[in-house]
Amino acid sequence: MDEIVKNIREGTHVLLPFYETLPELNLSLGKSPLPSLEYGANYFLQISRVNDLNRMPTDMLKLFTHDIMLPESDLDKVYEILKINSVKYYGRSTKADAVVADLSARNKLFKRERDAIKSNNHLTENNLYISDYKMLTFDVFRPLFDFVNEKYCIIKLPTLFGRGVIDTMRIYCSLFKNVRLLKCVSDSWLKDSAIMVASDVCKKNLDLFMSHVKSVTKSSSWKDVNSVQFSILNDPVDTEFINKFLEFSNRVYEALYYVHSLLYSSMTSDSKSIENKHQRRLVKLLL
């Protein structure tokens, strides 16, 4: 428990290994790989609590998270730490210290207003911006279309779950020699978003990757039609890399399970009020 609290209050990170050789690429747009246990068993424990929250009416979610949904300022914090003075979003600037893509639903918890759902058997979709592997779209590679000679490539990932995000990180670990994942204090600890910071580009591998992508998409520039789910590797990445990734993501999901459990206990408290011991513990933890 002490380690969970420490990660929430101080953040957590991991440095991923560099691979000189790209894995065999086979880009297919339109569908994500399905989840499986080898890509994170903790998710399947954590998703049970997410489903409990997903059943709650959104007006109640807003009430109980109003004071703990602080503005997500993790990207700004990363810019400050790395002394990044200018960033390039989707080609909007010709010269910058970093090229950036934010795939997260910044400062949002749910997708649409909704009443309560009776039981998990009646859940037909994940209405929360939490643990949704379908949120990872091919936009995660969009900065590479705009990358010239920037020092950093920075991605705000919408989730850490699923094969898609691990395959993506494995590719980035051949495109850049330094790839780090961060879950900052100033990110939302209600959601499984995180930041990837990559630097020291491997030009040879980047050229090979972009050649494959452009041949599949039949375009040398980014097209919005590519903003869809995708798969990119036929074969699973090696177990060593998966375990290194899970070393980071498990810390995040353990923390989320604790936070979500407190929130659910607060929302279902006998007091029938936001003034209860679970909410007080939650506020103390996150503020």
From Swiss-Prot:
It comes from the Viruses. Belongs to the orthopoxvirus mRNA-capping enzyme regulatory subunit family. It comes from Vaccinia virus (strain Copenhagen) (VACV). InterPro entries: Poxvirus_mRNA-cap_ssu, Poxvirus_mRNA-cap_ssu_sf. Keywords: mRNA capping, mRNA processing, Transcription, Transcription regulation, Transcription termination, Virion. This is mRNA-capping enzyme regulatory subunit OPG124. GO terms for biological process: DNA-templated transcription termination. Its main location: virion. One of its GO terms (cellular component) is virion component. Interacts with the catalytic subunit OPG113. Coiled coil: none annotated. One of its GO terms (molecular function) is mRNA 5'-cap (guanine-N7-)-methyltransferase activity. The keyword Phosphoprotein does not apply. It is found in: Virion. Regulatory subunit of the mRNA cap enzyme which stabilizes the catalytic subunit and enhances its methyltransferase activity through an allosteric mechanism. Heterodimeric mRNA capping enzyme catalyzes the linkage of a N7-methyl-guanosine moiety to the first transcribed nucleotide (cap 0 structure), whereas the methyltransferase OPG102 is responsible for a second methylation at the 2'-O position of the ribose (cap 1 structure). Also involved in early viral gene transcription termination and intermediate viral gene transcription initiation.
